[in-house]
Every structure is written in C-alpha cells, then in structure tokens.
Amino acid sequence: MLLAVDIGNTNITAGLFLEDELICMWRMASNRAETWDEYGLQLIQLLERDGHTPADITCAAMASVVPPLNPVLSRAVQQYLKVQLKELTGDLRSLPAVRYDNPAALGTDRLVNALAGWEIYGRPQGRPVIVVDFGTATKLECVSAEGEYLGGVIAPGIRTAAEALTRRTALLQRVEIQRPKSVIGRNIAASMQSGILYGFAGLADGLVRRLTQEIAPDGPDPVVVATGGLASMVAVESRTIQMVDPHLTLQGIRLMYELNWPDAAAEA
C-alpha cells in the first residue's frame, strides 16, 4: 500500500491507498518542535488503530509546503515504517504541460491538486478545471482541457484572515467559523461570521468567473472543484463551486507518485 503525506502549514494529513482507493486517513499537527521519533510513534499508533502494521506499507510519497518538516517526516517514515518517503517536487512528471514561469518553484500542493482535478474531473469530460483549495491560504489552480497547468491565484485563507481580524483590532474577539442565521449580523459574532463565510464565498465566485473568462472564453466552462477543511461550508454558499472533494490532495500525491515511480506503485 502507498502512504501519501500532505505536509501543510497547519496540519499533516496522511492517507493509505490500496491501489486507487483511499482506505484510511489521519491528521497530525504541523509542529516544527516535534521530533522524528514523536511523529514516527504517532504514525504507528494511527496505523494500529485502523488495523494496519508497518509491513502493509510498501511505498510512501509526500507533498510539502513546510520544508523544515520534510527531513523530520522522512526519517520518521524510514525508521518506523521501513520505506523511503519520496518527496514530490515541481520538476517531476505531472500534467502534460506546466505553463509556469519556474515550474521548480511551484508548490507541490498546488501541482498535485491541479493534477488530481484534471485526471479525476476534467479529463473524463474533456473540460478545463479550476481547483479551489480552502487551506491556510486560499489557492485556485487552472488547468486547460488538454491538461496544461496554466497558473492560478493565491489569497489569504479563511482562518488566516479571521485570525488577522482579531489580532489587528481591539474590540473583535475570535469567533467560531460557522454559518450565521442571516447575512445581516445583529451582533458582533454573527457579523464576523457573515463577513468570513459569505465574504470568502464571494471571493471564490468572483475569482472563478474571472478565471473562466481567461481559461475558456469560447469553449466549455471549467469543472470547479473545491477541497480543504472549510470547503463544504463555503461550497453551500457558492454559485460557482460544483463539487467538493476532501481527499483531492491525497489523490494528487498518489497520481504523481504513480507517474514517476510506476513500478513501485504497481506493487502498492
């Protein structure tokens, strides 16, 4: 089986694949103070909790936006799971073409999202794809119907913006991010919740419409798929997001690994 690891700024998400099926998934905090030994023990505990052992894992791959954690997780996987954790980078095989000024500088989280979005949703329909990832940053990735990565947009993340709002103001306190009863807030908490939720739904819709004009001015409209921790909540209020795939990034890691190490992937 393949262990796919997504190292994000807030969380580390790991998933176990049997061929193309995600059979279990776990989350750990992205903690730069944590040692490889501590992460290794966590992985063992999570595996055992779901009825698996290190012997079940034959290969592993990671996409990371936190470089200091890369060697930590690599050693944890090597020492505790006895496999090499392959690091996915922008210069490896992915989409048919990458139209980015410096492909090596493209974050692999963005690249694997684009790859999965096209392979799973765009390619079967012969349509372009826009992937909206609601993470620590809000990222939109654009892929043509032919599988060309065209670039994208990076904006503040929902929680990032909400935390900045409370830090930079004297009277606004942190609120739970949830759907308010109405767009018009009748207290401070509801007003903030409305601004956060409907504001980001509007941000996503506005960007998707502008990107669509550039991607497909005359062709079929793109498939718009969202992922990330708050994607489901925002998608309900969005007029452009067509579907939510919470496992898109892990699927992209699997797909990119299979493209670059096909022999090892075939044995997973």
Curated annotation (Swiss-Prot):
Binding sites annotated in the UniProt record for substrate: Y100, G107, T108, D109, R110
GO biological process: coenzyme A biosynthetic process
GO MF terms, alphabetically ordered: ATP binding; metal ion binding; pantothenate kinase activity
Cofactor note: A monovalent cation. Ammonium or potassium.
Homology family: Belongs to the type III pantothenate kinase family.
Function field: Catalyzes the phosphorylation of pantothenate (Pan), the first step in CoA biosynthesis.
Xref: PANTHER family: TYPE III PANTOTHENATE KINASE
Protein name as catalogued: Type III pantothenate kinase 1
Name of the coding gene: coaX1
